[in-house]
Amino acid sequence: TYSPTTKEDKLRDEVRTRDFNWIKSDIKPEERAYRNGHRAALILITGEPGSGKGPLARTLEHNLFQNNFQSYLLDRRNVNLGVSADLGDATVEDESARRLGEVAKLFLDAGHVVISTSNAFHKEDQEDLRLLANPYQVIEIQVASQPTGEPDITMSLDQAQDAKTASTKIQDFLKEKKILMGHNYSI
C-alpha cells in the first residue's frame, strides 16, 4: 500500500482527500466573481519584521473594502490565537501554517480577497499555502531591502512605508491580473 514519505506528499494527499470529499456550494466561483467584481485570491505580504507589512495589509484591506470588494485581513496571529490555540508552542510551525491555509481556503471559497502577512512565511510555507488555496491564485508581495525568490511584486522598505501608494500599486497589479475586474464586467 501507498504511504506518503515526505511532509509535502502527506499534505498533498490530505488536500486531495479534502477536495474529493468537500461539500461544494451550488454557487460557482464565477458567479461570486460577477457579484463581487473580483475573483477570489490569497495575497501574502512577506518580508522582514518592521518592514511595514502590517500597515500595508490593513491599508490594502481597507481600500479594497471601500471600493466594494470583499476583502479580509487574515493575520496568522489571529489564527494562532483561535483555531491553533491548542498547539501551544512554536515547535508546530508546519501545523500553524496548514491551519492558516485551511481558514484562508474557506474565505476563498466564499469569494474573498484574503490578505495575510507574516514574518514566518518561509518558501516551504508558501508552497503549502499555494497547495491549500488551489485553485485560487496566490500573489506574493515581498517587502525587503534585498528580495529573495520570485515574488509577484517586490517593494522596497521605503515604498511599503507609504502604504496608500503601495496599496494602489498592488490594486493596479490585481487589475492587470484580472483579479479585480470591477462591478460592471460580464462573464
Where are these regions (language model features)?
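Glycine-rich phosphate-binding loop of ATP-dependent small-molecule kinases
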Residues: 1-187
